[in-house]
Swiss-Prot record:
GO terms for molecular function: nucleoside triphosphate diphosphatase activity. Belongs to the Maf family. SUPFAM superfamilies: ITPase-like. It comes from Xylella fastidiosa (strain 9a5c). It is found in: Cytoplasm. It catalyses: a ribonucleoside 5'-triphosphate + H2O = a ribonucleoside 5'-phosphate + diphosphate + H(+); a 2'-deoxyribonucleoside 5'-triphosphate + H2O = a 2'-deoxyribonucleoside 5'-phosphate + diphosphate + H(+). This is Nucleoside triphosphate pyrophosphatase.
Amino acid sequence: MLYLASRSLCRRQLLQRLDIPFQVIDLEIPEVRREDELPQDYVRRVAQEKAQVGLARVRDAFAPKVLGADTEVVLDGRVFGKPADLVEAAAMLAALSGRTHQVMTAVSLVAAGGVAAQVLVVSEVSFALLSQGQIARYVDSGEPMGKAGAYAIQGRGECFVSRLVGSYSGVMGLPLQQTAQLLTTFEES
């Protein structure tokens, strides 16, 4: 049985597109970047921790496989996680305005017996120049809260994106092509 270790409704909806039965494990993992930890190492570690903690919760299930994922926005080496408040959300959007940033999503798959696999997908996202009014209206909508980098590409935040190179679903939180390939490879090994 496949389990998704995530509180993200968006990840649940994305995984449903693969037509694979799964159950959700609702868990909270502290997402704190270690000093001197590279952004890509950070997202890989958090995704792996989510999967491992999820596996510990379903250890007694028959042949459990647990999928964990983490997504972060990175600009000039600085990691933009989920904003703590509206002020931080506005500051993140102002920093991203008119710039190109990376969206890193790591997906980890673990199973009983220590079997594990992982993929990291990095997408490049360019934002148009945003006015203070645009930022204020978007922040007031509430959409930036709970989103890495303070925007949802699948929502109103899409109108800020002038260019995307990479995985649209990866920017949303679960790169579907790579996740499908990971699951297929995992089953074959």
